[in-house]
């Protein structure tokens, strides 16, 4: 009888997130039952499932929160090499920009998202909209242009196409990530004017025109302050000035401190979080439950959007 009663209680708990999705329970009431450990768990990346090779997030099975798997782009869907699945190699971003045709790019985004969904994935880590600052950048082919207007318009079209299929687009790498050499440790020194008119402008256009569900912060520092720990960038500019309502993830395996990223409004640390460090920060009074709740809410809101 004791085992049956416990199992019944667990089944009731697992149904709770479904109740939120179906309108029988508020997200506030759902989150009120989560422990600090549960919230911290939501703020770190989760192991690969299925064909994914870029990890995921969510994954609170006792509460019915699913694992939401990601897949890399941008020139087509990249999945685990161990899977015997074929995917489409779409033209790279630079070539798509050469069409000067946002409607066509939107169609590519839609078709790509359909393929993402067919493979039981939910977040496509594209578009990449960094600026062609130097022709020697090793990932220029992933970026649209040296012109932030073209990058923004093409990126917005891609996001609209992807999200029309209820798949989340992840706009990256925010911001001033314009080289590959030593990018986990580099510091992009840039004036306020150049930052806003060149390196942020494409992201601003995408946020205002396409409302992306996720944005990926970059490894690099900007004027001495790591992008993933930069509250001015993530809260004041991205959310405050531009009106971004979605979730922010780090780039994979950042060297930044997890609790500082949470304080800055960087919601999920990918590929995995550092829960013990976050707990230690809470014990030392450097981080509070309200900050965990702000980030976890955005994670759960994103999961509710995905079909």
Question: Language-model features: where?
Answer:
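Short acidic-aromatic active-site loops that bind/stabilize oxyanions
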Residues: 2, 32, 98-109, 192, ...
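Single conserved hydrophobic/aromatic residue that forms the stacking wall/gate
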Residues: 2-9, 13
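A structural signal for short hydrophobic/aromatic patches embedded in well-ordered alpha helices
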Residues: 27-30, 42-43, 108, 295
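Long, structured ligand/cofactor-binding scaffold of large enzymes
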Residues: 38-188
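Second-shell residues forming the walls of enzyme active-site clefts
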Residues: 144-294, 298-301
């Amino acid at each position: 009888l004791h085992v049956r009663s416990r199992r019944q209680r667990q089944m009731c708990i697992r149904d709770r997130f479904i109740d939120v999705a179906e309108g029988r329970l508020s997200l506030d009431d759902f989150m009120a039952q989560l422990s600090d450990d549960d919230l911290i768990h939501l703020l770190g990346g989760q192991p690969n499932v299925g064909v994914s090779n870029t990890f995921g997030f969510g994954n609170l099975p006792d509460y019915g929160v699913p694992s939401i798997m990601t897949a890399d782009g941008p020139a087509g869907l990249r999945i685990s090499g161990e899977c015997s699945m074929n995917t489409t190699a779409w033209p790279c971003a630079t070539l798509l920009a050469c069409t000067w045709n946002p409607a066509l790019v939107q169609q590519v985004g839609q078709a790509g998202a359909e393929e993402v969904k067919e493979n039981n994935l939910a977040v496509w880590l594209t578009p990449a909209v960094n600026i062609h600052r130097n022709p020697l950048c090793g990932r220029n082919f992933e970026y649209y242009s040296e012109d932030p207007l073209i990058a923004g318009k093409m990126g917005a079209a891609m996001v609209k196409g992807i999200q029309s299929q209820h798949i989340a687009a992840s706009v990256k790498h925010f911001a001033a990530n314009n080289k590959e050499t030593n990018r986990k440790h580099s510091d992009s020194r840039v004036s306020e004017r150049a930052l806003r008119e060149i390196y942020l402008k494409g992201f601003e256009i995408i946020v205002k025109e396409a409302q992306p569900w996720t944005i990926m912060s970059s490894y690099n520092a900007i004027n001495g302050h790591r992008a993933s720990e930069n509250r001015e960038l993530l809260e004041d500019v991205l959310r405050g000035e531009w009106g971004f309502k979605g979730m922010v993830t780090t780039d994979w395996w950042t060297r930044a401190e997890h609790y500082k990223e949470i304080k800055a409004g960087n919601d999920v640390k990918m590929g995995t979080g550092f829960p013990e460090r976050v707990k230690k920060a809470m014990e030392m009074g450097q981080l509070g439950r309200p900050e965990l709740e702000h980030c976890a809410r955005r994670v759960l809101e994103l999961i509710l959007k995905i079909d």
